[in-house]
Amino acid sequence: MTAETKRVGATGGMENSFGFTQIDEAQKQSMVDGVFHSVAENYDRMNDILSLGLHRIWKNSMITWLAPPAISGWKVIDVAGGTGDIAFRILNASRKKAHATVLDINHSMLNVGKKRAQINGLAPFIDFVEANAEQLPFSDQSFDAYTIAFGIRNVPHIDKALSEAFRVLKPGGRFLCLEFSNVEMPLLDKLYDLWSFHAIPKLGQLIAGNSDAYRYLVESIRMFPKQDDFACMINRAGFSRVSYRNFTGAIAALHSGWKI
């Protein structure tokens, strides 16, 4: 079952997945919020655990593929990017010529990002916005690029988030999504499962005092659509020239699309 599978629950409402657990659709966002409130201060460390530290290399590849220009007025929105990690990389790559909007539904994550922006001298180049990826508070054709890293699998309605991404991009705009994916190497998948389901929750308890949050994050990765299926979803949202690159045996994949 993919993250977009829906069933009718016992209360009559539609169901969605929270990791491996089926819940009423209306519950998912608040439950996901709870997870990220609890891990906000340790979010980058969490990604180190989930990716064995490789997320930093993957993010650098994401920025290289985006190739943000050193042009004043070039605007990017980074969705589910509360801690600012992707936005900071984009601003540095553009020599602080670009302007970034960091959008996240979770104020704890945004607070971490705001503090880091001040520390790194990047606050003048970033707006932090608390809002929902499914209902972006921006006009049509507002941005030159849309990025999202390790966030879209936590959105209750992925199709709505993709439609909103298409709407707010200018013609010629770029969509890039970095996400944990479906491991394709026979031995690596077994080793990664062992790491994910046995080691990660224990490390989550040790580092953040919250094994359940880390268990959800692992399960949410397994529930996310496979690379080809997600590419089809991007295409259905209206994007052209849709493609993806696998990283590290497909532990993660970087998806790209253009608004033509």
Swiss-Prot record:
<comment type="pathway">
    <text>Quinol/quinone metabolism; menaquinone biosynthesis; menaquinol from 1,4-dihydroxy-2-naphthoate: step 2/2.</text>
</comment>
<keyword id="KW-0831">Ubiquinone biosynthesis</keyword>
<dbReference type="GO" id="GO:0008425">
    <property type="term" value="F:2-methoxy-6-polyprenyl-1,4-benzoquinol methyltransferase activity"/>
</dbReference>
<dbReference type="GO" id="GO:0043770">
    <property type="term" value="F:demethylmenaquinone methyltransferase activity"/>
</dbReference>
<dbReference type="GO" id="GO:0009234">
    <property type="term" value="P:menaquinone biosynthetic process"/>
</dbReference>
<feature type="binding site">
    <location>
        <begin position="132"/>
        <end position="133"/>
    </location>
    <ligand>
        <name>S-adenosyl-L-methionine</name>
    </ligand>
</feature>
<keyword id="KW-0808">Transferase</keyword>
<comment type="pathway">
    <text>Cofactor biosynthesis; ubiquinone biosynthesis.</text>
</comment>
<feature type="binding site">
    <location>
        <position position="104"/>
    </location>
    <ligand>
        <name>S-adenosyl-L-methionine</name>
    </ligand>
</feature>
<protein>
    <recommendedName>
        <fullName>Ubiquinone/menaquinone biosynthesis C-methyltransferase UbiE</fullName>
        <ecNumber>2.1.1.163</ecNumber>
        <ecNumber>2.1.1.201</ecNumber>
    </recommendedName>
</protein>
<dbReference type="InterPro" id="IPR023576">
    <property type="entry name" value="UbiE/COQ5_MeTrFase_CS"/>
</dbReference>
<comment type="similarity">
    <text>Belongs to the class I-like SAM-binding methyltransferase superfamily. MenG/UbiE family.</text>
</comment>
<dbReference type="GO" id="GO:0032259">
    <property type="term" value="P:methylation"/>
</dbReference>
<dbReference type="Pfam" id="PF01209">
    <property type="entry name" value="Ubie_methyltran"/>
</dbReference>
<comment type="function">
    <text>Methyltransferase required for the conversion of demethylmenaquinol (DMKH2) to menaquinol (MKH2) and the conversion of 2-polyprenyl-6-methoxy-1,4-benzoquinol (DDMQH2) to 2-polyprenyl-3-methyl-6-methoxy-1,4-benzoquinol (DMQH2).</text>
</comment>
<dbReference type="GO" id="GO:0009060">
    <property type="term" value="P:aerobic respiration"/>
</dbReference>
<feature type="binding site">
    <location>
        <position position="83"/>
    </location>
    <ligand>
        <name>S-adenosyl-L-methionine</name>
    </ligand>
</feature>
<dbReference type="InterPro" id="IPR029063">
    <property type="entry name" value="SAM-dependent_MTases_sf"/>
</dbReference>
<keyword id="KW-0949">S-adenosyl-L-methionine</keyword>
<keyword id="KW-0474">Menaquinone biosynthesis</keyword>
<dbReference type="InterPro" id="IPR004033">
    <property type="entry name" value="UbiE/COQ5_MeTrFase"/>
</dbReference>
<keyword id="KW-0489">Methyltransferase</keyword>
